[in-house]
Amino acid sequence: MNIVTGQLNAHGKKFAIVVSRFNEFITNKLISGAEDILKRHSVADEDISVYWVPGAFEIPAVAKKIAENGKDNGVICLGCVIRGATPHFDYISAEVSKGVASIALQSNVPVIFGVLTTDSIEQAVERAGTKAGNKGSDAAMSAIEMVNLYSAI
């Protein structure tokens, strides 16, 4: 049996991080977590590009352009959508999820979903570096593994 896995060494690899400015008090923590993991796994500072977009809805469009340009080995999408009193949360969460998934399926580079969709600010804070870890860190680890897996396929 041949088992293929992605290694967790990212030396010489380039990563793009697309991050939403909306709920920036959370997304700043997600991006810090992602950058920390990338650097711990040998990604040079100059090989990390950060693209700020206004909100989560804009993430897929920018991620698609980056994935198509061929400059980066992986794209990490980070954002935070917190449920409010209107259905807006449902629409945004669904569309950003579908958009990132669609790009990931059509792209030759891994596109990783690291967008929080939470029912409360407390849940978002927990997932941005407190009780529930840092989902930005998790997304970066997934990106490293998937970049290496894509190379092995």
UniProtKB/Swiss-Prot annotation:
Matches recorded under HAMAP family: Lumazine_synth (MF_00178)
Protein name (database record): 6,7-dimethyl-8-ribityllumazine synthase
Gene Ontology biological process terms, A to Z: riboflavin biosynthetic process
Top-level taxonomy: Bacteria, Pseudomonadati, Elusimicrobiota, Endomicrobiia, Endomicrobiales
Record-stated family: Belongs to the DMRL synthase family.
CDD domains membership: Lumazine_synthase-I
Pfam families noted in UniProt: DMRL_synthase
Class of enzymatic activity (EC top level): transferase
A molecular-function term among this protein's GO annotations: 6,7-dimethyl-8-ribityllumazine synthase activity
Gene that encodes it: ribH
InterPro entries in alphabetical order: LS (IPR034964), LS/RS (IPR002180), LS/RS_sf (IPR036467)
Entry keyword set: Riboflavin biosynthesis, Transferase
Gene Ontology CC: cytosol; riboflavin synthase complex
